[in-house]
């Protein structure tokens, strides 16, 4: 059974296409820039870009805001806090924190697809304080500890 989520189009986003999957096999719904006219991201600059939407997700789900691969690969534009998390109980406007990692200015126009929103299941656990935790072969090996081969 397919889950349903409610979407609220804010006044500054009513004329934009609602998020949708670009193809039958897509994992992410495309989010669009709900800005007036255009904006320019200078190299190294980041900006919160409004999408003009609010969502109400069913319990047990979250929305992850992820970069669009084409923007990252071709222009160095990505989501700064990737993946951004939209909690199930958040009801405000979804905004995307875009950053320009390239050496060139990048212009975002109204209606441009700027990120993708992936809906995922969430599990919550109860943390119990302990005096010790179990041993593993890896132990406390951290970044790069398992090698590259």
Curated annotation (Swiss-Prot):
Matching InterPro entries: dUTPase (IPR008181), dUTPase-like (IPR029054), dUTPase-like_sf (IPR036157), dUTPase_trimeric (IPR033704)
Catalytic activity: dUTP + H2O = dUMP + diphosphate + H(+)
Organism per entry: Neorickettsia sennetsu (strain ATCC VR-367 / Miyayama) (Ehrlichia sennetsu)
Cofactor: Mg(2+)
Full protein name: Deoxyuridine 5'-triphosphate nucleotidohydrolase
Magnesium keyword on record: yes
GO molecular function, one term: magnesium ion binding
Coiled coil: none
EC number(s) reported in the record: 3.6.1.23
Encoding gene, per UniProt annotation: dut
Family the UniProt entry places it in: Belongs to the dUTPase family.
Keywords associated with the record: Hydrolase, Magnesium, Metal-binding, Nucleotide metabolism
Function in brief: This enzyme is involved in nucleotide metabolism: it produces dUMP, the immediate precursor of thymidine nucleotides and it decreases the intracellular concentration of dUTP so that uracil cannot be incorporated into DNA.
GO annotation, biological process: dUMP biosynthetic process; dUTP catabolic process
Entry-linked Pfam families: dUTPase
Keyword presence, Transcription regulation: no
Pathway stated in the Swiss-Prot or TrEMBL entry: Pyrimidine metabolism; dUMP biosynthesis; dUMP from dCTP (dUTP route): step 2/2
Annotated positions binding substrate: 68-70, 81, 85-87, 95
SUPFAM superfamilies listed in its UniProt record: dUTPase-like
């Amino acid at each position: 059974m397919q889950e349903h989520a409610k979407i609220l189009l804010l006044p500054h986003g009513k004329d934009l296409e609602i998020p949708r999957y670009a193809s039958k096999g897509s994992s992410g719904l495309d989010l669009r820039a709900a800005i007036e006219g255009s904006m320019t991201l200078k190299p190294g600059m980041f900006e919160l870009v409004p999408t003009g939407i609010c969502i109400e997700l069913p319990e047990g789900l979250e929305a992850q805001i992820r970069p669009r691969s084409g923007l990252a690969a071709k222009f160095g534009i990505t989501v700064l806090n990737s993946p951004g998390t939209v909690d199930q109980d958040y009801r405000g406007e979804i905004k995307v924190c875009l950053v320009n990692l390239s050496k060139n200015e990048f212009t975002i126009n109204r209606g441009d697809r700027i990120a993708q929103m992936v809906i995922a299941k969430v599990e919550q656990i109860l943390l119990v304080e302990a005096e010790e935790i179990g041993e593993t072969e890896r132990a406390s090996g951290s970044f790069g500890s398992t090698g590259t081969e």
